[in-house]
A protein has these predicted regions:
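Short, acidic, small-residue-rich periplasmic hinge/interaction motif at the N-terminus
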Residues: 22-83
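Extracytoplasmic beta-strand/coil segments of soluble accessory domains associated
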Residues: 55-78, 82, 88, 94-134, ...
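Short acidic/polar hinge/loop motifs at secondary-structure boundaries
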Residues: 105, 116, 133-156, 175-176
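Outer-membrane beta-barrel translocator/receptor signature
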Residues: 147-150, 161-238, 244-248, 300
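Transmembrane beta-barrel strands of outer-membrane/channel proteins
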Residues: 187-191, 215-219, 252-258, 318-324, ...
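Acidic/polar loop-and-plug regions of large Gram-negative outer-membrane beta-barrel proteins
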Residues: 220-224, 234-309, 313, 324-355, ...
């Protein structure tokens, strides 16, 4: 009975189109749909570097240096969009990537001074890119401002063919906000715990049909959960785009970030994670020296992106970027808890670093067909120069401090 029942349904389904075919043909009126993929003339929404409507990006340049649909790339690429960062209220790049598979974002805890991710088990501090250019640093890592970026893209797995020497775990590319040839104004103010006050703005406009501009800025005064550890920042990122015709585009971008973020120093295990005969050590305890410990950094970028399409088959692109990091740091770090379970040994650390980096990337993209197959080929030549000046001093001694009755100002430091 079950077999007959299935055959009867199949027969009925075959008969339906035959019955419909026998009816008279009805001609419907023509409907014309008009629209544009961008936001006005020269719009950038939905492109590989422009804003994304929602959480799901469809295009990327990180995986191939060509604007390519994500679904067509063999690599594993995760994209965190501006909308997702805003809805989650992220405060740093680590929080933005917390839900990205294969990425450990804060292996040293929430240290406001720097961002030190791990991708697929490999340290990726030296695999950070800004607009496709590698961020070069030594000791002076940096905590980038997420509000200044349109998207954060993680390419997992080796990428040396496109980007040169790097960690096998993958890279993180931070894509800066650019002009969109639309008018918008966004001004926000935030108040949070730990005396956190933030003011930020994102303003864009159109000067004429060929020129668009954008300015992103942020100012922050903030303490942290640990006493005497501040997390202050000033950030500015201007940009301007010039598009004289449909085939030519030139975008000039810059950014300047000043951070005054102190080191959390650290706390002993006995009294925090484990028990201590003298009681619990509060997470707000500061074991450094407020009048000695200091950390500040200046970080700036300036660069451009130029593209010209000669015809439907050939396009030339040239991107260049200069970055400068000036990092100054001195600190008494926690070096161990004594056998008495309350005396904390401390050691001095003084670091000064100045890094200058310049890179230029030339690309020629060609499109051609062989029979029914369509091809896109990329030929490129890039140049990079890095200069690093660094001084480090770990010599000297410092007086210990009582973890349960700290007295600051008793500093003995000799270098």
């Amino acid at each position: 009975m079950r077999l007959v029942h299935r055959l009867s349904i199949l027969a009925a389904s075959v008969a339906l189109p035959l019955s419909a075919h026998a009816q008279s043909t009805v001609t419907l009126d023509t409907v014309v749909v008009e629209g544009a993929g961008g936001s006005g003339a020269g719009g950038t929404f939905g492109t590989a570097t422009g804003p994304v409507d929602g959480y799901v990006a469809t295009q990327t340049q990180t995986g191939s240096k060509i604007s390519t649909p994500l679904i067509e790339l063999p690599q594993s690429i995760s994209v965190v969009t501006t909308q997702q960062m805003e809805d989650r209220g992220v405060q740093n790049i680590g929080e933005a990537l917390n839900y990205t598979s294969g990425v450990v974002t804060q292996p040293f805890g929430n240290d406001p001074r720097f961002f030190a991710p791990i991708i697929r088990g490999f340290e990726a501090t030296d695999s950070l890119y800004i607009n496709g250019f590698r961020f070069i640093r030594d000791f002076g890592a940096l905590a980038f401002e997420p509000y200044g970026f349109e998207r954060i893209e993680v390419l997992k797995g080796p990428a040396s063919v496109l980007y040169g020497q790097g960690a096998p775990g993958g890279i993180i590319n931070l894509v800066q906000k650019r002009p969109t040839f639309t008018e918008f104004r966004n001004v926000e103010a935030e108040i949070g715990n730990n005396s956190r006050y933030v003011a930020k703005f994102d303003v864009g406009g159109v000067y004429n049909e060929d020129v668009s501009y954008r300015m992103v800025g942020l100012g922050r005064l903030s303490e942290t959960q640990m006493n005497y550890v501040d997390d202050d920042r000033v950030y500015l990122a201007p940009s301007i785009s010039f598009r004289p015709d449909a085939d030519t585009s030139f975008t000039l971008m810059g950014s300047l970030q000043y951070d005054k973020a102190d080191s959390p120093v650290g706390l002993p295990q006995a009294g925090t994670l484990d028990g201590n005969p003298y009681g619990r050590i509060p997470p707000s305890l500061y074991l450094g020296e407020p009048d000695f410990n200091d950390s500040e950094s200046w970080f700036g970028t300036i660069g451009y992106e130029f593209s010209h399409r000669f015809n439907e088959a050939v396009e030339f692109r040239q991107n260049a970027q200069y970055t400068r990091l000036d990092f100054n740091y001195q600190n008494l770090y926690f070096s161990g808890l004594g056998a008495d379970n309350f005396t904390v040994a401390r050691g001095p650390s003084v670091q000064d670093e100045l890094t200058n980096s310049f890179g230029i990337d030339n690309q020629v993209e060609t499109r051609f067909e062989t029979g029914v197959l369509q091809h896109t080929a990329l030929i490129g030549l890039d140049y990079r120069q890095n200069n690093l000046d660094r001084s480090s001093n770990f010599s000297g001694t410092a007086l210990p401090i009582n973890a349960f009755d700290p007295v600051y100002g008793c500093l003995l430091y000799t270098s």
